[in-house]
Amino acid sequence: MMADYQSSNYQKYKNPNPVQHWLIVRFYTAILELLVKINYGSLLDAGCGEGLSIQKIMSENHDFHIYGMDLSLPAIKLAKNLHNQLIFIQGNVLNLPFKDKSFELVICLEVLEHLERPEQGLSELLRVSGGFILLSVPNEPYFRIANLLRGKNLSRWGNDSGHIQHWSANGFITYISHQTRVIAWRGSFPWIIVLCQNHL
């Protein structure tokens, strides 16, 4: 039986609105287009929420080890309920509970914009990655424009209350290039998705 808990993230991905659904489909299509460029046998989704991204990736790939981690205990409980064949743990992206180079691929979707020190989070993602990381963040100002167009967060000019960092596509690529090597990226309105290789 599904838990009563549903985060705003879960509601966003399950929203029946056709435009919202179309944007989410495009988002995951772009992610899968990037992932076909690499080989990996183990995956960590850091900031996995309820495991919906893992579910999308699993639909295309089956033969690898998957871990999901999130700060929210209710989200982890729901993820375990929805995907009981996978491993989900509670943890903080700023202090990942894994050894160095534990995973061939680490994904972190829509997390870094919530961090006061995103460089610390990125360092941890790189530490536990033995190969690649896949990141996504809102592409500003398009994310806020999209919110305004649908009447969301009007008093904050479209900005989500939890978003501390605001990057354009070029700004984000420049920012992460100080710590990792960008292989490829995709713009999927209103997000940017970047595939990087751990060169540390």
For each feature predicted by the language model, list its residue ranges.
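Conserved N-terminal segment of class I S-adenosyl-L-methionine
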Residues: 1-99, 122, 149-200
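Conserved acidic residues
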Residues: 41, 104, 131
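Conserved SAM-binding loop
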Residues: 68, 114, 135
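A conserved beta-strand element that flanks and buttresses the S-adenosyl-L-methionine
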Residues: 107
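Hydrophobic adenine-recognition pocket in adenosine-nucleotide-binding enzymes
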Residues: 111
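A short, conserved alpha-helix within the catalytic core of class I
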Residues: 115-124
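Conserved beta-strand signature within the Rossmann-like core of class I S-adenosyl-L-methionine
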Residues: 130-138
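Short "lid" loop at the C-terminus of a central beta-strand within the Rossmann-like core
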Residues: 139-143
